[in-house]
């Protein structure tokens, strides 16, 4: 079980209370698909992903980015038991979708980068530490089925 300080919980809840899912989600997933092109193999049904412009303008990528970001709400609502909260998604991604678990970390990093760009100076070192701790726990939970 992860121990969360009151400060960490406050920071994480504050981030999500102001999060623009429709902006951050598509940008983060697009960034992941552009920067790490091998991750595109999981999105073959999304249509044209041939270049950065196509990825950024792809409605399926945008919709899935929003869905992924809303998936973090599951962790937010279950801070005391994030592993169990993601057990079903871990199984889905490992057994049915066969997603490389390293991709969760790559997407997590992209979410953090896009969030940092959006928050600017408000994305302090303390904010980053709390957010990345949260993301690391979610990534670990999603990868649990692989262990």
Curated annotation (Swiss-Prot):
Other noteworthy facts: This fish has two hemoglobins: Hb1 (major) and Hb2 (about 5% of the total). They display the Bohr and root effects.
Record-level GO BP terms: hydrogen peroxide catabolic process
Membership in a protein family: Belongs to the globin family.
PANTHER family, per database record: HEMOGLOBIN FAMILY MEMBER (PTHR11442), HEMOGLOBIN SUBUNIT EPSILON (PTHR11442:SF7)
Assembly and interaction partners: Hb1 is a heterotetramer of two alpha chains and two beta-1 chains.
Name the record gives this protein: Hemoglobin subunit beta-1
Assigned keywords, A-Z: Heme, Iron, Metal-binding, Oxygen transport, Transport
Gene field: hbb1
Residues given in the record as heme b binding sites: 64, 93
Gene Ontology CC entries for this record: blood microparticle; haptoglobin-hemoglobin complex; hemoglobin complex
